[in-house]
Regions:
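Bacterial N-terminal signal peptides that target proteins for export
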Residues: 1-8
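Bacterial N-terminal signal peptides
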Residues: 9-18
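Solvent-exposed, acidic/flexible segments
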Residues: 32-36, 64, 175
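Short, well-ordered alpha-helical segments enriched in acidic and aromatic residues
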Residues: 46-64
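Low-complexity, intrinsically disordered terminal/linker segments enriched in charged
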Residues: 132-204
Length: 204
């Protein structure tokens, strides 16, 4: 039979074990968890359209600043609205991927009911962002439109799109010029038949 003394000792032991378990669970976060938090903050700042806050996060990823800064200005100028934000995912020991689906003026100008998903792949070194790469599931017609504008209406984009996604200073003006060009493409005889509009891009 357990005596009062035994019961007291058992209660103390159980309490100590529980306390230790809770302490372990509340311990320092894993490096992967830290990277996920940083990546989520990166997405927050990217779509808050605050370039100073975004660039502050990219101090250790200087080579990525020209493209990401332009992307941010392009997204703001094109009225990008987040339709679906998936949680960022660790895709490697030092890599996190974040996929964001947006609606913007470019696809609206083409008259296509399709929202593009942009994926940002962040590489880390010593807990800091080392680089950011981007990819997209934009349809083939999107790239056809861009090529058409380049060839048929270079006057629209010649000045505002200098340094496009490579440090250009007027991303907002650039995307607005592209929207105008895309709208012209949509009413041109070069615009694809409806059956071809949702064709995936072939960028090989």
């Amino acid at each position: 039979m357990l005596t009062v003394r035994h019961l007291f000792a058992l209660a103390v032991a159980v309490g100590f074990a529980t306390s230790c378990g809770a302490s372990n669970r509340a311990g320092p976060q894993s490096p992967a968890g830290d990277q996920l938090n940083v990546a989520e903050t990166f997405i927050d700042r990217l779509y808050a359209f605050d370039s100073a806050e975004l660039n502050a996060m990219l101090g250790t990823a200087a080579d990525s600043i020209p493209s990401i800064s332009f992307y941010q200005g392009w997204a703001e100028g094109g009225h990008s609205q987040v339709v679906q934000r998936r949680p960022c995912e660790a895709t490697g020991p030092q890599r996190v991927s974040c996929s964001i689906t947006v609606q913007d003026d470019l696809m609206l100008a083409l008259g296509i009911d399709f929202n593009v998903t942009d994926t940002f792949t962040l590489s880390f070194a010593e807990g800091e962002i080392a680089s950011v790469a981007t990819s997209s599931n934009a349809l083939q017609v999107f790239w056809n439109a861009q090529e058409w504008v380049n060839e048929e209406h270079p006057e629209l984009i010649g000045v505002p799109c200098q340094g496009m996604f490579d440090g250009g200073l007027t991303p907002g003006e650039c995307v607005r010029a592209m929207v105008e060009g895309y709208a012209r493409f949509a009413v041109s005889t070069d615009f694809p038949e409806a059956s071809a509009l949702l064709q995936p891009a072939n960028r090989n």
